[in-house]
């Protein structure tokens, strides 16, 4: 059945223009000709479906925190049509058999596209034996031990060689264990003033530096997870200037908060931690000049009990799928820090290009798109989240703009209750 979407402001080739588009058989088709169904979008903006390359869906193994059903429902509500699932699961996806434990649930329960990562090391331990990259490659978007840094330089070099051979990226959580020293927030003024244990910036950037050298040596495509320090940004900038296949992401909380905003509350605890104002400024500069090409949420839900133990004892991780776009639109687009077009590139276009993912608004694409209501205003209320996780440092923030409709493969998977269309 052909559906014609009219009265829209459509993102195309880096700009918005008034227009219409059509979907048939799950794909975008030419708008001309007779349509079986017409949907008037009321002048709303339409963008390629958002893509989050860093999500913890927790299933299998930790369904008390999140399930694939609840996590992907949250993603759809946030405007995401594709999410990439991190491998810190039980069983960890380190063989085709253990990966299948996850993909079977994805096929049954997911409402958006879920593309899994395979582990780098067996058991996702960050050490020991490497996985069989060739065996996992057909079913994964890349290889990661997110949550752990691969400590051995030799092991990481061999991992990059094997990943390069199968044409997949290494997606690295960069953290030198020997530099952590029991820390859990940034080693800055707040940490020292309140008697906490700090995580130094070098624990991140030192491993980024090592890995970039290995990526250059092996020819591997290399992506840095959740950069948080100014040194990491500069290292990636220099690597890109040299033409290396290096990319990186950061998350909304690192762009909108710093350690000056910390409270004695587990909602403010994540890894890497909120860094200094100077680090945040460097991240914003990296967004502006294109060094940072991706914004990902690092959606990491935990139970209420796990997040209720203060900064020292709470589990690390916050949720982000349902409010990432609306926060960034309110606090980065509206003040003129980035354009809406730039934000769409960071949250939809660039992740697809870097990770070779499908879906979009061009004729022939899988019809994955998000309809945005840029006038919607509300407060972030974790009690209304579809995710099982409730811990966000943005609770109570006033926001503007949100997904009014999310469509995956031509199928509507989310519609905001305020969204009305003429059919």
Locations of regions flagged by a protein language model:
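Histidine/acidic residue-rich metal-binding segments in metalloenzymes
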Residues: 128-295
């Amino acid at each position: 059945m052909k559906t014609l979407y009219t009265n829209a402001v459509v993102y195309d080739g880096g700009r918005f223009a008034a227009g219409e588009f059509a979907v048939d058989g799950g794909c975008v088709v030419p708008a001309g000709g007779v349509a079986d169904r017409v949907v008037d979008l009321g002048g709303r903006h339409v963008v390629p479906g958002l893509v989050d390359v860093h999500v913890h869906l927790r299933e299998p193994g930790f369904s008390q925190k999140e399930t694939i059903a609840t996590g992907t429902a949250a993603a759809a509500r946030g405007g995401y049509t594709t999410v990439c699932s991190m491998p810190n699961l039980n069983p960890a996806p380190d063989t085709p058999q253990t990966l299948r434990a996850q993909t079977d649930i994805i096929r049954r329960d997911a409402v958006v596209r879920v593309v899994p990562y395979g582990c780098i090391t067996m058991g996702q331990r960050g050490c020991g034996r490497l996985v069989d990259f060739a065996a996992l490659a057909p079913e994964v978007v890349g290889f990661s031990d997110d949550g752990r840094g691969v400590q051995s330089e030799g092991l990481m070099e061999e991992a990059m060689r094997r990943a390069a051979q199968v044409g997949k990226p290494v997606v690295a959580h960069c953290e030198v264990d020997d530099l952590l020293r029991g820390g859990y927030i940034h080693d800055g003024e707040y940490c020292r003033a309140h008697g906490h244990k700090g995580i130094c910036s070098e624990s991140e950037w030192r491993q980024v530096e090592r890995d970039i050298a290995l990526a250059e040596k092996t020819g591997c495509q290399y992506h840095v997870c959740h950069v948080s320090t100014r040194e990491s940004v500069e290292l990636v900038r220099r690597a890109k200037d040299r033409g290396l296949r290096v990319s990186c992401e950061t998350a909304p909380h690192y762009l909108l908060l710093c350690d000056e905003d910390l409270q004695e509350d587990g909602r403010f605890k994540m890894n890497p931690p909120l860094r200094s104002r100077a680090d945040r400024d460097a991240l914003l500069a990296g967004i502006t000049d294109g060094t940072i090409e991706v914004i990902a949420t690092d959606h990491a839900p935990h139970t209420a009990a796990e997040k209720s133990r203060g900064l020292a004892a709470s589990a690390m991780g916050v949720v982000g799928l349902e409010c990432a776009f609306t926060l960034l639109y309110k606090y980065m687009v509206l003040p003129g820090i980035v354009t809406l077009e730039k934000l769409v590139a960071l949250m939809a276009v660039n992740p697809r290009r870097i990770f070779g993912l499908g879906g979009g608004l061009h004729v022939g694409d899988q019809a994955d798109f998000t309809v945005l209501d840029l006038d919607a205003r509300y407060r972030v209320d974790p009690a209304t989240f579809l995710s099982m996780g409730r811990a966000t440092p943005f609770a109570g923030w006033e926001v503007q703009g949100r997904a009014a409709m999310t469509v995956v493969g031509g199928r509507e998977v989310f519609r905001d209750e305020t969204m009305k269309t003429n059919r």
